Amino acid sequence: MTQLASAVWLPTLLLLLLLFWLPGCVPLHGPSTMSGSVGESLSVSCRYEEKFKTKDKYWCRVSLKILCKDIVKTSSSEEARSGRVTIRDHPDNLTFTVTYESLTLEDADTYMCAVDISLFDGSLGFDKYFKIELSVVPSEDPVSSPGPTLETPVVSTSLPTKGPALGSNTEGHREHDYSQGLRLPALLSVLALLLFLLVGTSLLAWRMFQKRLVKADRHPELSQNLRQASEQNECQYVNLQLHTWSLREEPVLPSQVEVVEYSTLALPQEELHYSSVAFNSQRQDSHANGDSLHQPQDQKAEYSEIQKPRKGLSDLYL
């Protein structure tokens, strides 16, 4: 379960971090829609955060939904002008104002109020912006004439969705695809890849978990035996050593031989002889226990002859 949770939450966390870095996830503050009449002037106020106080601000026109054509931008000064559009930064109150002069019906479109963010500012170079829908309506002032008037048909004018950029004929105007528009397709590709990895990892982890559950349900006794064997795996083997004795082998007798000596002592007389006899006790023990298979061939006796002692030495023998 721990591996399953980590496999699901890790891609989700990466996705949330990437969404946090998307342009517009920390938007500027301002109106979402503005409306003006033909020939009038229109001002839009955009508020930004204090950390963007020293950054350049710009106003651009959205093209093809993903590109933004730069109209006017504050590069080094707090105020810039391009044709009928003026932008002025107010660092004291953290706002900048965009002013349109002499609105026309072709000015109706979608615009962006944005702050220029460099690549080394910790936001991966994604600019902060928000979109504004600008609509322009015809002027309502009636045209009066002193003579008889003729009824003229009312012509309904529809607002165009696209139009030329303002101030395109002025010197120094830059009309190009802004860098944030170029980054957006790559960003969408990364998002799609992360979503694919998230779904694939989740399905794989869930499938592995289901397989384990199915195996445990089909063979409950096998899983129980395996658990018992794993718990008792240290006592499964015993080393046994057997010692055998050959039937042909005779028991080992003591290496030392006990010798019993018999001696007879008597008072010294003439022509007396003394003898001592020694028998092997090893042979007697083997006869008593029945372990010997053969009778001894002969018995050896040792004799010692003692002559009559000299006179005066008889007391020594006694």
Swiss-Prot record:
Biased composition (Low complexity): 139-148
Record field: compositional bias (Basic and acidic residues): 297-308
Annotated S-S bridges: 46-113
Family annotation (Pfam families): SIT, V-set
Residue(s) carrying Phosphotyrosine: 303
Chain positions carrying an annotated carbohydrate: 93
Keyword Phosphoprotein in annotation: yes
Tissue/organ expression: Present on the surface of the majority of myeloid cells and a subset of B-cells. Present on the surface of NK cells after IL-12 stimulation.
Post-translational modification comment from the UniProt entry: Phosphorylated on tyrosine.
InterPro entries per the UniProt record, alphabetical: CD300_family_receptors, Ig-like_dom, Ig-like_dom_sf, Ig-like_fold, Ig_sub, Ig_V-set
Domain named Ig-like V-type: residues: 28-129
Cleavable signal peptide: 1-27
Annotated region (Disordered), positions in chain: 139-174, 284-318
Keywords for the protein's UniProt record, in alphabetical order: Cell membrane, Disulfide bond, Glycoprotein, Immunity, Immunoglobulin domain, Membrane, Phosphoprotein, Receptor, Signal, Transmembrane, Transmembrane helix
Subcellular compartments: Cell membrane
Feature: compositional bias, Polar residues: 284-296
Record's keyword annotation contains Zinc: no
Transmembrane segments annotated in the record for this chain: 186-206
Membrane topology: Single-pass type I membrane protein
SMART domains per UniProt: IG
Family indicated by similarity: Belongs to the CD300 family.
Subunit field text: Upon tyrosine-phosphorylation, interacts with PTN6/SHP-1 and PTPN11/SHP-2 and INPP5D.
Protein name, per record: CMRF35-like molecule 8
Protein encoded by which gene: Cd300a
